[in-house]
Each structure stands twice: as C-alpha cells, then as structure tokens.
Design a protein with these regions (language model features):
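N-terminal signal-anchor module of multipass membrane proteins
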Residues: 1-43, 307, 311-315
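Peri-membrane helix termini and adjoining interfacial loops of integral membrane proteins
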Residues: 1-3, 76-83, 241-249
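Extramembrane terminal tails and long inter-domain/linker segments of multi-pass membrane proteins
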Residues: 1-12, 47, 86-88, 119-142, ...
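Membrane helical hairpin/interfacial module
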Residues: 27-107
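Alpha-helical transmembrane segments and their helix-start/interface "positive-inside/aromatic belt" motifs
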Residues: 15, 47-61, 95-100, 142-150, ...
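Interfacial loop-to-transmembrane junctions
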Residues: 279-301
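Aromatic-anchored segments of alpha-helical transmembrane domains
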Residues: 160, 298-305
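Long, contiguous internal "core" modules enriched in hydrophobic/ aromatic residues
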Residues: 22-27, 41-44, 107-286
Length: 318
C-alpha cells in the first residue's frame, strides 16, 4: 500500500477531517476534566488566574466549535445540519452526540462564566451596560456552582468517551466495532488536554515551567499515559482473540504496510516512547524547552492515533 492509496481506498467512508474533529473534541474534554480536578484538589490554584483555566476558557469551547465546523462542512449537504439540532433520535449515535454537545456547551459557558465572573461583569458593563440579566444569571448560579461543576465533569467524561462510541457503532468494520474504543479515546483525550495545558503553562511561565499547577497536571498525566498503553494493548489483544473478521482487521492494520509503520513509528515511537524518555530530561530541565519537547511529541502522537484508528479501522469490512 502506497502513501496515496493509504488515504484513498474502496471501503473508506470517513476521512481526515473526521480524525481532526475527534482530536479537537478530545482536547476540549481533556482540558475541562483536568481543570475541574485541579479546582477540586487544589482550589487555591484553580481561580481565574490559572493558566489551565484560561486555556480551558479559550480551547474548551473553541475546539468544540472548530471541530463541529469541520464536521458540518464535511457533510454532503452541510445546510441540512440544523435538522440534527432539533430532531432527536435516541437510536442514533450521531443524534445522541448532538444532544450531548448542546448540553455540554450550555453547561460549559455557565461554568466558565461563573469562574471568570469579574471579567464577564466588567465586559458586560463596558459593552452592554443595559444587559443586567448577565449579573442576575451569575448570581443565580452561585448556590449551585459546585453541582454545576460536577455535572460539567460528567459531561466532559461522556464527551471524551463519545468519540469512541461514534466509531465503535460502525458494526460493518470489525476493527472499529470494539468496546475498548470509548475508554481509549477518553484517556488519550485527557492526555492531549494535559499536553496542551502544559505547553500553555511553559509559554506563560518560561522561567518556571514546573509550578504547582504544572506539577498537578504532570501527576495526572503519568497514570493516564500508562492507562492509554494498557488500553491499546487490550484493544489489540481483543482483536487477536476475536472472530475471523477481527483477526483479518488486525492483520491489515499491523501486518506490515503504511499503517503498520504509522502506528509503530508515529503512535508508539513518537507519541509514547519518546515522551517517556524525554520526561527524564524535562524533569531536570530548568527551561521550558523540555516541556515543549515532551508535550509536543505526546500531542502529535494522540493526533496520529486518531488517524490510525480511523483509517486502519476502515481497511477491513465484515
């Protein structure tokens, strides 16, 4: 299989824009999850001045919006997407996802608005002084903010897992029809969120890339990476022990060829082994270059994993 044919083959239905969409959704869910955990375990570090919270403020909703725009314009008839926003089907994974996105965005906006309440009120008084309902809504949220935050955490976890459910629902592809995918996508999304957050912290505090906030994310990142490795192993073991279709799918993905090299060199080599090796140097480094190297490799590995799962998963049809 040549590089050209690896991205264009007869059984391919979902191509590269979907991989980027899945990647962006994972970043949003990962950032929100880490931000809430930071506020729970280190309340003093989870205020509006937190780099993690500020990054979440921009990329939490931003990645979702950009990802959905990619998805909409990738549709054959993008102008019909609005129908999915109002016509729900509890038997459709896509429709359930739209419902989840809508609820996620509403709760996310309210949660972030309360955290950045002073900034929101200052902007409202400057640009929309007559829109007093903003302050009233923020005041109403106050007694329920912790419950809202708990709901936000649940929705972030569901969204991170949903990207895996979306692919695992494709029953005609043995590689993708795997119950491990939701958990794998959830933890790899948290890993990508951690990488983005650490890059933001390193760029903002170049003289001290190992702040309390950064150390918390590092502590969360390490077990997440090992869980990701375990889930990858479980994913392939499940294929190896499966029926004829799953064994054919495994052989097509890892039995040599373009996508096999993509996985071993890109996902495993660049995305897992190199960050683990570089982390030893980064932990001793007093500059931000070590953090950028580790997180850049890890983030690239997560993106390559999305491409591998999507394309290699469509090589074999049941």
């Amino acid at each position: 299989m040549t590089p050209a044919s690896a991205f264009h083959f007869a059984s391919l239905v979902w191509d590269w824009p979907i991989a980027i969409y899945l990647f962006l959704i994972g970043i949003s869910a990962g950032l929100v999850t880490l931000a809430i955990l930071l506020r729970r375990f280190h309340p003093e570090a989870g205020g509006s001045d937190s780099t993690l919270l500020r990054t979440t403020l921009v990329l939490g909703p931003g990645a979702i919006i950009f990802g959905l725009l990619i998805l909409v314009f990738h549709l054959t008839r993008p102008w019909t997407f609005w129908k999915l926003m109002f016509h729900y089907s509890f038997t459709s994974v896509m429709s359930m996802g739209v419902m989840l996105f809508q609820l996620y965005m509403v709760v996310l906006v309210l949660w972030l608005a309360k955290i950045f309440e002073k900034e929101v009120i200052a902007l409202q008084q400057r640009w929309l002084p007559r829109l007093e309902i903003v302050q009233k809504v923020l005041a109403l949220i106050t007694p329920f903010h912790r419950a809202l935050e708990t709901l936000m955490l649940v929705l972030a976890v569901l969204l991170g897992a949903y990207t895996g459910f979306l692919l695992s629902a494709l029953k005609s592809y043995p590689f993708l029809n795997n119950p491990i995918l939701p958990a794998l996508f959830l933890f790899s999304g948290i890993s990508s969120g951690a990488a983005v957050a650490l890059i933001a912290m390193a760029l903002r505090h170049r003289s001290n890339p190992h702040s309390t906030e950064a150390r918390f994310v590092h502590r969360m990142e390490t077990p997440v990476v090992w869980l990701e490795i375990f889930l990858l192993a479980a994913f392939f073991i499940g294929l190896a022990l499966g029926d004829d279709g799953k064994m054919r799918a495994l052989a097509a993905a890892l039995g040599g060829g373009f996508w096999s090299w993509w996985f071993w060199l890109g996902v495993v080599g660049l995305g897992l082994i190199i960050p683990l090796l570089l982390k030893l140097w980064a932990n001793r480094s007093v500059t931000f270059h070590g953090v950028l190297a580790v997180c850049g490799a890890s983030l690239t590995g997560v993106l390559l994993l999305r491409f591998f799962i999507l394309y290699a998963g469509q090589l074999t049809v049941a």
